[in-house]
């Protein structure tokens, strides 16, 4: 993996003096851009500067092939003029497929990821975008003609860009562009939406940033810049031509789901130099356990361990309170996984220590934008740091799994059957649910008949490919990766899995009194049975952070004056959710003051 940045000047038809002046200013801007990456965990920087462009790539030697990258890759036309150049922040999941399908060179299979993607894109750009899988953001330059920026379909990586006059600036880090001016105008709409959303979503659209004029590639987007302007388009839409896979047997559905998901997990695990290891953010939940269920055996077959990182409270084994759904200490679940797989080496991170205000201020600068996950991001960042210290190059997770591999919701199924007027199936499903969970049938029917529109399976399916959510997750992961040198990979948001879950009938996710069936039924034998069978508890990571917030509340309010007012929620007064909101609003208002002149 890596970071990319650069400047392209489309100015033409000038005198020699004017060209020299522009080339001189471009070199000065290039130097400032390079300095913006001074604190990033990069193994080396490769760059090229000409009068009309500057292209750079900071490489991280995470995979075995990364050390052989030679950016920018370059081709000349037969007459020695024109040609193209290419820089990429890339790790491919289907290297061999691209090399053999589009390049027809078997020897290329051993070459670096960036070279494979470049050779493939040069020959068949549209087909390459349709087939390529992995985490990547790329810049393809045809000097004097156009600059093309594109990223992977699910936004694992991306790039910011800004156009001023005839110049285009692009950068993996926002600082690579913001460093080119002393003052910027704020994007008022971005802040208004940030404050208006009452949950932990920081963004509601996939392109805008806090800086007016600076945009970011949305997941699965391609942007083409010329002297005249820019053309943007989406190259992957899993909803286009979507059809449900009806009529298969239960065994066929199981085989389809397990085969696709196994490939999603195994394809992101790469061999690294110098014994680079594979880690995982592991809880007692189904998402990360689904990933571990395939990652651990895959690594064990190669004589390797899987290193897990879990946030826990300081006091060991907080007892489960009878009737309480949330489990505050997930050590017990992780130890079950360790016994089950044999090659898991867990590490526990205590979350009720530290200075929440100082940590979130530091994270705000690292993420280059206000964030809302003020309780979770500090311990997640610590997991990345610990993974780096342990020598992990890849850090697996199951962040997107709730809406893909482990999705399932009774109410959504009931409403779907109701809207489809499938009365017999609806009665059977309600009866099964009522018997298992001891819920009144009358209460269930009343709830369904008074439910608002937009809550059935079709409505939920729209979130299976949610560009705003994918952008937010990917944006945080890229910044944490550049700060620590660890590359995050989440198989639960592989585009193959997203396309698959969008094609499955609603009953595959929830049926006969059981929800989240893709994991609970189809992954039996891959996850400890005690975890699969426990439908009445859910792990709660970062419990100690909540306790820290209460203990440090007065000091936070003194440092951030807007915090207390925002935290007061009407008649309810001061609630924990209100405290979280007050905290992130106070941090965002403090960040916003940098735009004041």
Pin down the residues of each PLM region.
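Short, hydrophobic/amphipathic alpha-helical patches that form generic packing surfaces
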Residues: 3, 118-120, 192-200, 382, ...
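Structural motif
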Residues: 107-112, 127, 184-188, 453-464, ...
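ATP-dependent adenylate-handling active sites, centered on carboxylate activation for C-N bond formation
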Residues: 8-24, 143-166, 227, 237-461, ...
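Cysteine-centered catalytic environments shared across enzyme families
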Residues: 1-349, 525
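PAPS-dependent sulfotransferase catalytic core
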Residues: 409-410, 527-584
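Residue-level detector of well-ordered alpha-helical segments, enriched
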Residues: 213, 497, 518, 522, ...
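Polar, surface-exposed loop/tail segments
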Residues: 112, 116, 516-522, 534-544
